[in-house]
């Protein structure tokens, strides 16, 4: 397995690997990583579909990529997915997945054309004081603190270790709009990993100019399940892949001799009945270890989503594997000590009455029902005790929605603070109470909130997710298992709790697909290179552009930097009529 850039290998078709007809694949989990592994086995590994088996404990595929109308509850999406043009492995896969919407097109074509016709942007990112846009929304307001971000990027991961974001940055950094944008967009909290924040800063530095208004982002036409999962399922079914639901893998016995690790037996329950599959070294096993949406509980408009700390299948499986080898990671690092303040609850509100719409449209300046971009991403309420954010994507978000309905995704970044209006913690609230808090912050008159939050006007389903921010917990090398653990012959880890050699960023669709691609190509010795992530952090043009936008579009001479006038004058003379001057001018720094 190796990496490549450019389009020479991107458009090449790898030849059939030697011995692939004697191999079989067993994939644990039908989240995006598991589905992608099956796609790459077929497309690039030339493995017959009937030799590929996927095991899913739930009755539905997709993992965290959800979107469903739950009987007796209503429409539910537990989270959203933000994409960008440099998700190299993701677009590499979806170019081969036929669109279910446009005959003869790929899903990449469908997505690309949608974004061309209706590019994403936000007209309002931050509000406060009951529905009023923050005056300096659109500015990072970092000032001198921009140098702290540069300092983070200059550090090595080894030197940061398990340091938290709060331990690295000053208090003034957290007062900036940059931190509000960053924390609420990516779900970072102060006690999360400084290493992961550094990875994010380096990975997405080319989008610094487009984060405040979300022009850097791209979204699906519908919810994640309909748009992203269904086309892959259709592709796999067309290749006769075996997908088994209500099947929970509980353990995998691994034989370790002479420095080699060979998966020998898969233990599982199928519809509650214990079964086992004996394996040979030619049987390839791909494990999705851990899950941010494992053990989710659902409330209703009148019921709370009950808090839980149940580990569930994916975490228990990882624990059983980790007990066999230190090379299989340390799951407790991620799930055991999540602070009470962490994000745990999201909610999906379905607006059924036009009385609420004006309070939204005065922020977006867009028609909710024209089928185009609405909020363009989340709108964050900066004076919300919950640090509440909400998003309204293109409507309908579900094909089953009625013509006048609008679905809204809501979440609170802080779970142990009382609301400004409801005076309860978000995890103690019913769907109606979460709606009341949201309407209060939108500026709905207090005497109308109770009525407009009633089920006659809106239906809101809260979800409690005990491990939703576990990706970002402080960690050190070895806490996440390598995609191919040292000495492994036939066992791979895939998904966002596996350690990709690429140092890409977790909590992204790209990372799920990348780890799957790395695992398949490693086992089958694929002769085609895996696309590198866009290394914008090593492009001086992108760095200069980011420096300009982090300082709110100021030229160097106007920045609050400790540069004496004499040195500045000498510096200008030295670079005059040089390539450096050209670069600085292109970045608007001179």
Swiss-Prot record:
The active site is at residues 82, 200. It comes from the Bacteria. It holds the Pfam family MCRA. Its cofactor is FAD. FAD binds at residues 33, 56, 64, 82, 249, 291, 508, 512. Binds 1 FAD per subunit. FAD does not seem to be involved in catalysis but rather in the structural stabilization of the enzyme. GO terms for biological process: fatty acid metabolic process; response to toxic substance. InterPro entries: FAD/NAD-bd_sf, Oleate_hydratase. Monomer and homodimer. Both forms seem to be active. Catalyzes the hydration of oleate at its cis-9-double bond to yield 10-hydroxyoctadecanoate, probably in the (R) configuration, and of linoleate at its cis-9- and cis-12-double bond to yield 10-hydroxy-12-octadecenoate and 10,13-dihydroxyoctadecanoate. Is not active on trans-double bonds and esterified fatty acids as substrate; is only active on cis-9- and/or cis-12-double bond of C16 and C18 fatty acids without any trans-configurations, producing 10-hydroxy and 10,13-dihydroxy derivatives. Appears to play a role in oleic acid detoxification and bacterial virulence. Unsaturated fatty acids are toxic for many bacteria due to deteriorating effect on bacterial cellular membrane and disruption of bacterial fatty acid synthesis. The hydration of unsaturated fatty acids is suggested to be a detoxification mechanism and a survival strategy for living in fatty acid-rich environments. This is Oleate hydratase. It comes from Streptococcus pyogenes serotype M49 (strain NZ131). The gene is sph.
């Amino acid at each position: 397995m190796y990496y490549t850039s450019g389009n020479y290998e991107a458009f090449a078709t790898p030849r059939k690997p030697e011995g692939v007809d004697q191999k079989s694949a067993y994939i644990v989990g039908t989240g995006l990583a598991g589905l992608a592994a099956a796609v790459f086995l077929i497309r690039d590994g030339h493995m017959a579909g009937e030799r590929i088996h996927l095991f899913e404990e739930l009755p539905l595929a997709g993992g965290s990529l959800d979107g469903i109308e739950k009987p007796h509850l209503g429409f539910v999406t537990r989270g959203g997915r933000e994409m960008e043009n440099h998700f190299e492995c993701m677009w590499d896969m979806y170019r081969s997945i036929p669109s279910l919407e446009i005959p003869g097109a790929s899903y990449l074509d469908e997505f690309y054309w949608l974004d061309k016709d209706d590019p994403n942007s936000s007209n309002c990112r931050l509000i406060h004081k009951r529905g009023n846009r923050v005056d300096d929304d659109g500015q990072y307001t970092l000032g001198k603190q921009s140098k702290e971000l540069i300092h983070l990027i200059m550090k090595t991961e080894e030197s940061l270790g398990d340091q938290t974001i709060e331990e690295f940055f000053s208090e003034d950094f957290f007062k900036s709009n940059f931190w509000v944008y960053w924390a609420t967009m990516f779900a970072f909290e102060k006690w999360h990993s400084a290493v992961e924040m550094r990875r994010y800063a380096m990975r997405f530095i080319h989008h610094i100019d487009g984060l405040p208004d979300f022009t850097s982002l791209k979204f699906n036409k519908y919810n994640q399940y309909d748009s992203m999962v269904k086309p892959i399922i259709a592709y796999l079914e067309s290749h006769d892949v075996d997908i088994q639901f209500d099947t929970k893998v509980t353990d995998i016995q691994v034989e370790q001799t002479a420095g080699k690790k060979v998966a020998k037996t898969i233990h599982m329950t199928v519809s509650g009945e214990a079964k086992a599959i004996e394996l040979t070294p030619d049987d390839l096993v791909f494990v999705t270890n851990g899950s941010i949406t494992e053990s989710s509980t659902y409330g209703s408009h009148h019921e709370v989503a009950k808090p839980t700390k149940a580990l569930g299948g994916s975490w228990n499986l990882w624990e059983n594997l980790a007990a066999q080898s230190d090379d299989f990671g340390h799951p407790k690092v991620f799930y055991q000590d999540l602070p009470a303040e962490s994000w745990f609850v999201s909610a999906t509100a379905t607006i059924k009455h036009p009385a609420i719409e004006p309070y939204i449209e005065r922020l977006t300046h867009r028609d909710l029902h024209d089928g185009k971009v609405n909020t363009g991403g989340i709108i964050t309420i900066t004076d919300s005790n919950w640090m509440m954010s909400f998003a309204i994507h293109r409507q309908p978000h579900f094909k089953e929605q009625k013509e006048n309905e609008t679905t809204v995704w809501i979440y609170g970044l802080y779970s142990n603070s009382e609301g400004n209006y409801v005076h309860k913690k978000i995890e103690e609230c019913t769907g109606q109470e979460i709606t009341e808090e949201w309407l209060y912050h939108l500026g709905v008159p207090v005497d109308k909130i109770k009525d407009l939050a009633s089920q006659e006007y809106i239906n809101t389903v809260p979800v409690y997710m005990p491990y939703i921010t576990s990706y970002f917990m402080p960690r050190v090398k070895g806490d996440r298992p390598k995609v191919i653990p040292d000495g492994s012959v036939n066992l791979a880890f895939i998904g966002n709790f596996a350690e990709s050699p690429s140092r890409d960023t977790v909590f992204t669709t790209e990372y799920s697909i990348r780890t799957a691609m790395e695992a398949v190509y490693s086992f089958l010795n694929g002769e085609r290179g895996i696309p590198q992530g866009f290394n914008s952090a090593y492009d001086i043009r992108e760095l200069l552009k980011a420096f300009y936008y982090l300082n709110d579009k100021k030229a160097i001479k106007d920045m609050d930097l400790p540069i004496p006038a004499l040195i500045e004058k000498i510096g200008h003379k030295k670079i005059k009529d040089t390539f450096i001057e050209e670069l600085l001018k292109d970045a608007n720094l001179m």
